[in-house]
């Protein structure tokens, strides 16, 4: 009886896995790629390439006006959004993308980040324009308010809120927490239940402070850990400097001529690189997902354009810098060690960071866990 139940359980699990895999392949096929990249390109064109205002956006980080309505500073709102964006996907996820779609996926991920800046600009602008002030004086906003107040479609706004909450549990919590648990178990043999308990306690402690408490934690951890992680990547690239330009050329070749990590025909390999790269870009910077605009709505900023510029810089840090650095680091490691298979994303990432003497593995673990915690909070 027990064996029959066990076999039925595994068969159900295999069926569910196959169904989810087929659905994922359909979802990330040509229609969604065209719609997502098409939206990025369309907004880039009609807004006359807002990416060119990146330096102005960076300067606005330090402009603060406490007379503006809002709950947190514009810089803190960006840090909360980046906290939700910069997570396991920027570290382990890039390795998984390379394993699935080859090094060419790094280019498509990077391109999605650059073009996605226009979409995040639009999301930030609409978040400020259609936000509302609650009875307690706090600001609420996001795509659900844009859909309800801008398009006069309450049911669509409600549907967006429900599906966003569901996605938050999946890509925002379960995936991130699992990545941290696996890394801590691999590095320090910490049981998964212990990691889950600590993450739950930390999250509850910070969330008791409301949006201000979350913003304070994110405003400290996100820049601090991003700088440490970037310095670690730069060290690895310095050690493997002779492979940097070959790695970039390899990424570009794989993006257009097609050379998937697992092999296959050229056309299928290009499609795999595009699909995994664009998916990783969306998973990383959320440009087009809409959830990052919820944090933008809480900013002390009455000028929608100013907040839109600040919001648009998010994909730059998240995808153009961190994801691209990770991708180049991993590709240099592939070229430097051709005997090592690149079909195992997590192992490839661990190998790359082993180039940092003494602190390579702890640095990778610390970066991953910190980014995971900030993602769950964001």
Predicted regions and their residues:
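Flexible loop linkers connecting adjacent transmembrane helices
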Residues: 49-74, 96-106, 110, 118-151, ...
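Select transmembrane alpha-helical segments in multipass membrane proteins
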Residues: 33-38, 73-81, 153-167, 197-198, ...
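Helix-loop-helix module between adjacent transmembrane segments
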Residues: 39, 43-44, 112-137, 143-207, ...
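N-terminal alpha-helical transmembrane segments of multi-pass membrane transport
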Residues: 1-88, 98-105, 116
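Alpha-helical membrane segments and immediately flanking helix-loop junctions
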Residues: 68-100, 126-144, 148-150, 162-165, ...
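Extracellular/periplasmic helix-exit of transmembrane alpha-helices
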Residues: 123-130, 232-250, 262-264, 298-301, ...
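Membrane-interface loop-to-helix entry segments
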Residues: 35-42, 46-59, 179-184, 191-252
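Selective recognition of specific alpha-helical transmembrane segments in multi-pass small-molecule
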Residues: 115-123, 197-211, 222-242, 275, ...
């Amino acid at each position: 009886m027990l064996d029959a139940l066990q076999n039925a359980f595994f068969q159900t699990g295999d069926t569910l896995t196959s169904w989810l895999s087929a659905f994922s392949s359909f979802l990330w096929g040509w229609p969604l790629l065209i719609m997502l990249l098409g939206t990025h390109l369309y907004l880039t064109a009609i807004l006359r390439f807002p990416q060119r205002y990146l330096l102005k956006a960076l300067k606005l980080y330090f402009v603060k006006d406490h007379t503006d309505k809002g709950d947190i500073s514009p810089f803190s709102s960006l840090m909360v959004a980046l906290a939700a964006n910069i997570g396991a996907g920027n570290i382990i996820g890039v390795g998984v993308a390379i394993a699935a779609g080859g090094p060419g996926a790094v280019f498509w991920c990077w391109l999605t980040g650059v073009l996605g800046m226009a979409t995040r600009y639009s999301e930030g602008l609409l978040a400020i324009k259609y936000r509302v002030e609650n009875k307690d004086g706090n600001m609420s906003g996001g795509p659900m308010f844009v859909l309800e107040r801008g398009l006069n479609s309450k049911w669509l706004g409600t549907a967006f809120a429900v599906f966003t909450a569901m996605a938050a549990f999946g890509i925002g919590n379960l995936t991130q927490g699992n990545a941290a648990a696996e890394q801590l178990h691999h590095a320090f043999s910490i049981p998964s239940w212990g990691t889950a308990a600590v993450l739950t306690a930390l999250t509850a402690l910070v969330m008791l402070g409301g949006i201000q408490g979350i913003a304070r934690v994110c405003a400290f951890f996100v820049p601090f850990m991003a700088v440490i992680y970037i310095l670690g990547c730069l060290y690895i690239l310095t050690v493997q400097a002779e492979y940097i330009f070959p790695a970039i050329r390899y990424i570009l070749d794989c993006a257009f001529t097609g050379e998937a990590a697992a092999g296959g025909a050229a056309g299928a390999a290009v499609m795999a690189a595009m699909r995994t790269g664009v998916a990783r870009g969306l998973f990383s910077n959320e440009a087009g997902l809409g959830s990052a605009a919820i944090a933008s709505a809480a900013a002390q900023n009455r000028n929608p354009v100013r907040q839109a510029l600040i919001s648009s810089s998010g994909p730059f840090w998240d995808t153009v810098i961190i994801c691209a650095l990770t991708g180049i680091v991993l590709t240099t490691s592939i070229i430097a060690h051709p005997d090592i298979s690149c079909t195992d994303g997590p192992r490839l990432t661990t190998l790359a960071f082993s180039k940092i003497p003494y602190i390579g593995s702890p640095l990778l673990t610390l970066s991953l866990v910190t980014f995971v915690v900030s993602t769950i909070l964001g």
